[in-house]
Amino acid sequence: MEATKQNGMNKDQFWNLIGRAKEVCGTDLEASAVWIKQQLFYMTSEDVLKIHNLVYSYRDAAYKYGLWTAAGIMMETGCSDDGFSDFRMWLIAQGKDVYLNALKDPDSLSGVTPYGYCSFESLGYISSQVYSAMKRKNIYQDSTAKMQMESYEQVIRDIVYHPMIEYPLELPEAMVVYPKLCECHLSEQARQAPQKVKTWNVSRTDIRRMMARGNAAIKKMQEQGAKAPEAARSVRKGTVR
């Protein structure tokens, strides 16, 4: 037994749980899911609810086009909408430092070894399954919008976002902004002719607009002969679910 029933789940305890799962289970995601589920059954239902809100708050705080760009490069086969959701769950499972560093600089993912297809969809289901077993009700009956917002606001206080993280980038631009990640995961063919690889749905107006802004920021950076500016804290709030 690793946990005892006690109230007071917070961000530090959440990350301790995630870190311990990584220590115990390594890269075995199925074993990690089983282990985390076992630990949650030793907790109070109130703490299980808090964990649920924290998992989804961290997932939503990572919904950034720049990280999505990096995920597609790291996965080497591109990254769909659902794939990016599962990638963010996988990123959470790598622990606090890897998660926060990836948002501060997605290029830091060059130092993270991919495994399990960089996908951990089941992490999002564990708390709801445990809560349902404990309370005989759906967790969303008790997870209020106010709780979710409070959880999200707590989460983003610790996050420093990379200045280019809002922008979806095609490979030529990604090679400028995330050079180490591209060096690790792009094929020689892709590195030689990155303009031939298309990863974004440019039929969407919002994607085209954000790509244009990102390209303009890169052009300005190159004209000034400077490296990517230091990451700055973002005050923009994401989606709370």
Residue locations for each model-derived region?
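N-terminal leader/targeting peptides and immediately adjacent processing regions
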Residues: 1-46, 197-203, 210
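Non-catalytic, well-ordered alpha-helical scaffold segments
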Residues: 12, 49, 53, 81-85, ...
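Generic structural signal for hydrophobic core residues of well-folded globular domains
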Residues: 21, 39-43, 55-62, 90-95, ...
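Short coil/turn segments at secondary-structure boundaries
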Residues: 30-33, 66-73, 101-105
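A glycine-rich, hydrophobic loop/mini-helix early in the fold
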Residues: 41-79, 84
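Hydrophobic/aromatic-rich, well-ordered segments within soluble, folded domains that form packed cores
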Residues: 73-103, 109
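Basic, alpha-helical nucleic-acid-binding regions used in initiation and control of genome expression
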Residues: 99, 105-113, 117-203
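Non-Sec secretion/translocation targeting segments of pathogen effectors
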Residues: 211-241
